[in-house]
Design a protein with these regions (language model features):
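Acidic, Mg2+-coordinating active-site environments of NTP-dependent enzymes
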Residues: 9-10, 71-77, 194-348, 371-372
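Active-site beta-alpha connecting loops in nucleotide-dependent enzymes
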Residues: 45-48, 332, 357-388
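Short gly/ser/thr-rich secondary-structure transition/capping motifs
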Residues: 18-27, 89-92, 155-158, 177-183, ...
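N-terminal leader/targeting and accessory segments in enzymes
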Residues: 1-93, 97, 241, 268-273, ...
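Active-site regions of enzymes building and remodeling cell-envelope glycoconjugates
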Residues: 76-85, 148-151, 254-257
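Conserved phosphate/oxyanion-binding catalytic-loop motifs
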Residues: 351
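Phosphate-binding loop of NTP-binding sites
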Residues: 10, 90-238, 242-255, 285, ...
Length: 388
């Protein structure tokens, strides 16, 4: 793909290219991975500035440089520098254009807790209902049974759009992906055609990065204000404090809103009764009552399952088979996962809970299933949000 193709419609960028129109073979923001024909995005971060590595990138064969307005031009006259106001956002948009194709139905899930489980449950429901489905998040990229390990909740733009393109090429039509506050704040999801956006909940996390709770919420809200397509649907937890704010934001854009939870108008949780193998649910949806057995323990898993249900309905699934499919859900690895029993028969669970709210939630979830003492073992990484 020529630079002029990649920058199509951006006259300012083409002007800065000064007649140079190299063949672009890839994109990267890591100067060490530059190859012949790559665009090097000189991004600034909390600890380093990519503009320091422009010369290194050119030595390795960079065909063009994407950088912030005001960045000095490189000494190599044949390597154009494209200055933009927001290099991170533009980098993601270029990655989307370079890789080209995406599955038709992409649901992005944000919130402090529940993103992974909701994404995997959504993928499972779509698959049960006969759709070629995949997911992207903390557990890596999953598509048609294959798994590609990952370490970030939201991958960098190149890995993300490459993954979406590969999913499209193998026939995946439905993708559920996690949208972290870091990923949203750093514009990693820009260029993704999000058709359904879901919000699970919000509690203290990542304040070492965002600086305040308001900024943390604002990063999450970008999914609804900036990224959800104009004819998309917002799936919102009606039981959280942020519901009214997000609903008003979405309605102002003319978006469809679908709510779930005890206070919801669309998928209303009437009752959730725990038993030895899961939870008995009574739901009101589409003017009908549904009684099903969810094979998952914990009220938080109930909410994650309802979020997934709302997502698949918002993406076009018929409500009756979608609700019945909840009875076939399987637990997610590392999320309230039963890994064994002690010598005296006490069950041992592993859970990803790492925030104060998540720890409290998971302990409350096991209480109905435990007559005696609950032992909780947890750790805390250093150098992060000490208030947790």
């Amino acid at each position: 793909m020529r630079l002029s193709e990649l920058m199509a419609g951006d006259q300012a960028a083409l002007k800065h290219a000064q007649g140079q129109d190299p063949d672009i073979t890839g994109l990267t923001a890591d100067s060490r991975t530059v190859k012949d024909g790559y665009i090097f995005a000189a991004l600034s971060g909390a600890k380093d500035d990519g503009s320091k590595y422009i010369a290194d990138a050119i030595k390795l064969g960079a065909a063009a440089i994407l950088a912030k307005d005001g960045t000095p031009r490189p000494s190599a006259p044949t390597v154009p520098l494209i200055p933009v106001e927001n290099p991170r956002k533009r980098y993601a948009q270029l990655a989307a254009r370079f890789y080209g194709q995406q599955p038709a139905n992409i649901a992005a899930i944000t919130g402090t807790n529940g993103k992974t489980s909701t994404a995997i449950f959504t993928e499972q429901l779509w698959t049960i209902m006969g759709n070629m489905s995949g997911s992207i998040g903390t557990l890596g990229i999953r598509a048609a049974g294959a798994k590609i390990p990952g370490s970030l909740t939201t991958p960098d733009p190149v890995a993300l759009h490459q993954g979406l393109n590969e999913m499209y090429e193998i026939g995946v039509t439905h993708v559920a992906m996690e949208a972290s506050s870091h990923g949203l704040d750093q514009y990693r999801l820009d260029g993704v055609k999000v058709t359904v956006a879901a919000f699970t909940n919000l509690s203290r996390d990542h304040l070492d990065y965002h600086g305040s709770f308001d900024k943390y919420f604002a990063a999450k809200a970008r999914l609804f204000s900036d990224l959800l397509v104009a004819d998309g649907t917002a799936v919102l937890n009606a039981d959280v404090e942020q519901f009214a704010t997000l609903k008003a934001m979405c309605e102002k854009r003319g978006l469809t809103v679908m709510s779930y939870g005890e206070n919801a108008d669309d998928i209303k949780l009437v009752s959730a009764i725990p038993d030895s193998t899961g939870t008995k649910l009574t739901l009101l949806a589409n003017k009908g009552e549904y009684k099903i057995h969810l094979p998952l323990m914990g009220s938080f898993q109930v909410m994650n399952a309802l979020a997934a249900l709302a997502i698949v309905i918002a993406s076009g699934a018929d409500i009756d088979p979608a609700v019945l499919a909840l009875e076939k859900l399987e637990g997610v690895r590392g999320r309230m996962e039963l890994v064994g029993k002690t010598s005296f028969g006490a069950p041992v669970f592993v859970d990803y809970a790492h925030t104060p709210d998540a720890l409290e939630t998971v302990i409350k979830a096991v209480r109905p299933h435990c007559k005696g003492r609950i032992v909780c073992v947890f750790g805390a990484g250093g150098d992060r949000d000490t208030g947790k």
